[in-house]
Design a protein with these regions (language model features):
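N- or domain-start disorder-to-order transition segments that initiate the globular core
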Residues: 1-35
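Generic structural signal for short, flexible, solvent-exposed coil/loop and linker residues
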Residues: 5, 45, 50, 80-83
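A short acidic-Thr-Gly-centered motif at the start of a beta-strand
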Residues: 33-45
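Beta-strand elements within well-structured catalytic alpha/beta cores of enzymes
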Residues: 46-58, 94
Length: 157
């Protein structure tokens, strides 16, 4: 039987986002990612760009890319995804510095009792249709969060 791999919440995508907050002087919500903290401390960066490659885990790199290729040869370390490891939950965690249980953006399609609809979250459509779920962004309205950029701007004086 395969061993269950649990998320390492001390070394995760949420930690990465919190390192960015820390670097720009914004309050952090959780542990930071030591590897990124060290990298950011080496120089004074005016901008930090995060490139999120959905589904690009270590096993994908090892199994599909050349060892001397760009990604494999520049790999500095690994960290855990959040749980649930869905595109929506992971992306929102990177964008907010919060765990899915805190931001509540859990999956591609989520049911919102307040409007009695299942919404394709990132598209703001009724699930399985092209029809807008509402005339406002449902998930952002009912489960609001501040993006990293908003948090940094708010705390930059």
């Amino acid at each position: 039987m395969k061993k269950i791999k649990y998320p390492d919440y001390m070394n995760s995508t949420v930690s990465l986002a919190n390192s960015v907050l820390k670097y720009f002087g914004a309050p952090v919500h959780h542990e930071t990612l030591a590897l990124l903290d060290r990298e950011l401390a080496e120089r004074e960066y005016e901008n930090v760009v995060l490139l999120l490659l959905d589904g690009m885990g270590k096993c994908i790199i090892d199994g599909n890319l050349e060892p001397d290729g760009f990604f494999a040869s520049h790999l500095a370390g690994t960290y855990s995804a959040v749980f649930p490891p869905t595109t929506v939950a992971a992306t929102t965690s990177i964008c907010s510095g919060l765990y899915p249980v805190e931001h509540c953006w859990l999956g591609w399609d989520c049911y919102y009792p307040k409007i009695d609809k299942t919404v394709t979250v990132f598209l703001n459509r009724e699930a399985g249709t092209t029809k807008p779920a509402a005339d406002y962004p449902v998930a952002k309205t009912l489960c609001p969060y501040q993006s990293l950029v908003e948090q940094i701007r708010e705390n930059s004086g």
